[in-house]
Amino acid sequence: MGLKLLESRLCLLLSLGLVLMLASCQPPTPSQWFEIQHIYNRAYPRCNDAMRHRNRFTGHCKDINTFLHTSFASVVGVCGNRNIPCGNRTYRNCHNSRYRVSITFCNLTTPARIYTQCRYQTTRSRKFYTVGCDPRTPRDSPMYPVVPVHLDRIF
């Protein structure tokens, strides 16, 4: 009896581990990818570090990237502002921020085949921004019905 109970618990733990492993292998949702790409993370204060973290998801060096020094929740709030056409004029799901935020702009200066070896120039500024927003996916937090998925421009 004790052995069967141990075997069933072990089987349950292995099954749970497999489910968690498969869930973590899923690519990020569009809004999770937006957060990875564009929300400033204090753990990576310099462009070289921030872009190394960002580039590990794609395995290559992105030429340019803008990080907004604000929270994901604040950008979600911008999604509630008036709709405007996006830069490509195909979509009308864009929204302008009402306030300037600090930004970090990263520009690739030293490309490399191995993404961890790329080097970036850092430029800081304060700018308004425009984001594209879409309804959340089932894997996004139910806290926000509409989420940012695209940084359209800074101005």
Swiss-Prot record:
**Which residue pairs form cystines in this protein?**
C47-C106, C61-C118, C79-C133, C86-C94
Q: Cite the active-site annotation.
A: H38 (proton acceptor), H150 (proton donor)
Q: Which residues are reported to be glycosylated?
A: N88, N107
Q: Where in the cell is it found?
A: Cytoplasmic granule
Q: Could you say which residues form the signal peptide?
A: 1-25
Keyword Hydrolase on entry:
yes
Give any single GO term for biological process.
defense response to Gram-positive bacterium
The identity of this protein, by name, is Eosinophil cationic protein
Q: Which organism is it from?
A: Rattus norvegicus
